[in-house]
Amino acid sequence: MPRPRKRQAGAAGPDKKQLSGKRTKTENSESASVKLENSSLEKTTTFKTCGKNLSNYWLMKSEPESRLEKGIDMKFSIEDLQAQPKQTTCWDGVRNYQAWNFLRAMKLEDEAFFYHSNCKQPGIVGLMKIVKEAYPDHTQFEKNDPHYDPSSKEDNPKWSMVDVQFVRMMKRFISLDELKTYHQAHKATGGPLKSMTLFTRQRLSVQPLTQEEFDFILSLEEAEPS
């Protein structure tokens, strides 16, 4: 997850060959098979019709409230993103193999919900877009960073990040409680949020959305909170 004090997006230089792995603020490193995660990735993040890839949609979590980890404040809210140069930053620190696979699957102009997590009122607060596809995450090499990985080498990096840019605030805050209410109802009726990853893989801080899920959540902006 990005932090205001970090270098500007793209500062790590040109993209290198495909890497492997990354973390999000709320995730810990997991011992997992990359092969298994790649299989999961194919099933959950690439939507195809007649052999053509459709747009991908995402939900990306970040912590809006201060929390120190190894002396560094992990806070990064949507307001912090708005305050960045060109309202753009690198989404670094992902250290979970499945989340890393999701980051690698992201394409330019993919849309993502900015989700405030690990706070008093978790939920969706805004929209952003992917403006640079996966490239090496510089924090894996920085010894003083909470996400330093001594097993990762600059000539063979393990973890990746993407660059994101603020698009807009949501017209209203969409809370976790509201989403959960719809999820539970849709499990019974077959509605759009019946299988939403936010509730089936809660700890993942980078999550895929189907277009149906994305469109339904956008439609909630115009509705009264449930």
From Swiss-Prot:
Major subcellular site: nucleus
CDD domains on file: EVE
UniProt entry keywords in alphabetical sequence: Nucleus, Phosphoprotein
InterPro entries tied to this protein: 5hmC_binding, EVE_domain, PUA-like_sf, THYN1-like_EVE
Region called Disordered, residue ranges: 1-38
UniProt keyword Disulfide bond present: no
Highest taxon, organism lineage: Eukaryota
Motif extent (Nuclear localization signal): 5-10
Amino acid composition bias (Polar residues), ranges on this chain: 29-38
A GO cellular component entry from the record: nucleus
Post-translational modification: Phosphorylated.
Keyword Kinase among UniProt keywords: no
SUPFAM superfamilies, per the entry: PUA domain-like
Subcellular location(s) of the protein: Nucleus
Comp. bias regions, Basic and acidic residues: 14-28
Gene3D superfamilies in the record: ph1033 like domains
PANTHER family: THYMOCYTE NUCLEAR PROTEIN 1 (PTHR14087:SF7)
Function: Specifically binds 5-hydroxymethylcytosine (5hmC), suggesting that it acts as a specific reader of 5hmC.
Protein name per UniProt: Thymocyte nuclear protein 1
UniProt organism field: Rattus norvegicus
Taxonomic lineage of the native organism: Eukaryota, Metazoa, Chordata, Craniata, Vertebrata
